[in-house]
């Protein structure tokens, strides 16, 4: 088989998926508005909970491979409350060529609350993924966001000897850009993570973003940080708080993240996090 035919087959096998929907407050209850689903990305809405509406993303492709593309576009209307999570940890497989692309857009209107709480993203050795998260909040909207990335299947002793991870975050509040960050790791990622100035040997990293956030939020988290299983840093500026973690044990980092989310919000975590 020629390289052209092989490339055509590879392109045809790439997964595509998109979910876009909005929620709105009606008679004191958050309800789903318009919903669009396509490809291998789906969303399910469990039974309503006391604290707004919950949504669970399901990737029917079973993971993310090279060349895949997934797009998520979510809007919470005035006063609505929405928590988003995933049905399971997302696996990103070895990619011999093009990186997978993931684009996430989150918008919250006045008085709305968004919780973006996916379970872990696990990168297999030589996985390649480029992710972008764009968040646009009204001045008095609130956000609780977390992301955990595990480099290599640590339970199997796998290291990332190669691969690519690009992560772009942009946060706007009241129309102003208040936070922008791009993380890029490629080549022998395991070797880079071993450096003290990067992750000091950690194989998992996590970030929690709390808006609004101040020193009171930081102190609540710091009170619990002595029991954390890895390294952590917590700070607040520009009206939001952020906690960052790295650990050699992905399960321990997940437990630390659950502690932080509980102290930051006081609300119950999605039930899938408790399995």
Language model: regions and residue ranges:
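Feature marks extracellular polysaccharide-active and adherence modules
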Residues: 77, 136-138, 172
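Short, surface-exposed recognition loops or helix-turn segments adjacent to catalytic cores
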Residues: 119-121, 146-151
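Basic (Lys/Arg-enriched) interaction patch that binds polyanionic ligands
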Residues: 126-127, 132-134, 145-148
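A structural signal for small-residue-enriched, beta-sheet-centric alpha/beta enzyme cores
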Residues: 149-275
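A short, polar/proline- and glycine-enriched secondary-structure boundary/capping micro-motif
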Residues: 41-45, 93-98, 126-128, 154-158, ...
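Structural motif
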Residues: 81-83, 113-115, 142-144, 206-207, ...
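N-terminal, charged/glycine-rich beta-strand/loop interface patches
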Residues: 2-120, 125, 132
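N-terminal intrinsically disordered, cationic/polar leader segments
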Residues: 2-38, 101, 107-116, 128-130, ...
């Amino acid at each position: 088989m020629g390289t052209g035919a092989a490339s055509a087959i590879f392109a045809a096998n790439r997964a595509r998926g998109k979910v876009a929907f909005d929620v709105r407050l009606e008679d004191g209850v958050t309800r789903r508005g318009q919903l669009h689903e396509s490809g291998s990305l789906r969303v399910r809405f469990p039974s309503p909970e006391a604290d707004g509406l919950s949504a669970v993303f399901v990737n029917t492709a079973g993971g993310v491979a090279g060349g895949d593309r997934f797009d998520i576009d979510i809007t919470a209307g005035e006063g609505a409350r929405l928590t988003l999570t995933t049905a399971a940890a997302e696996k990103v497989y070895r990619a011999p060529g093009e990186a997978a692309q993931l684009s996430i857009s989150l918008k919250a209107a006045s008085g709305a609350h968004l919780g973006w709480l996916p379970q872990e993203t696990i990168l297999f050795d030589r996985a390649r993924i480029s992710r972008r998260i764009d968040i646009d909040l009204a001045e008095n909207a609130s956000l609780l966001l977390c992301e955990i990335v595990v480099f290599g299947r640590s339970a199997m002793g796998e290291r990332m000897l190669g691969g690519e991870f690009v992560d772009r975050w942009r946060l706007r509040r009241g129309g102003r850009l208040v936070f922008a960050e791009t993380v890029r790791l490629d080549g022998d990622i395991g070797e880079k993570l071993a450096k003290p100035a990067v992750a000091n040997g950690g194989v998992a990293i996590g970030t929690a973003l709390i808006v609004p956030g101040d020193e009171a939020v930081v102190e609540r988290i710091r009170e619990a940080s002595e029991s954390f299983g890895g390294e952590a840093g917590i700070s607040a500026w520009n009206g939001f708080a952020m906690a960052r973690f790295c650990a050699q044990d992905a399960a321990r980092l997940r437990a630390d993240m659950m502690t932080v989310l509980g102290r930051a919000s006081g609300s119950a975590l999605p039930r899938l996090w408790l399995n």
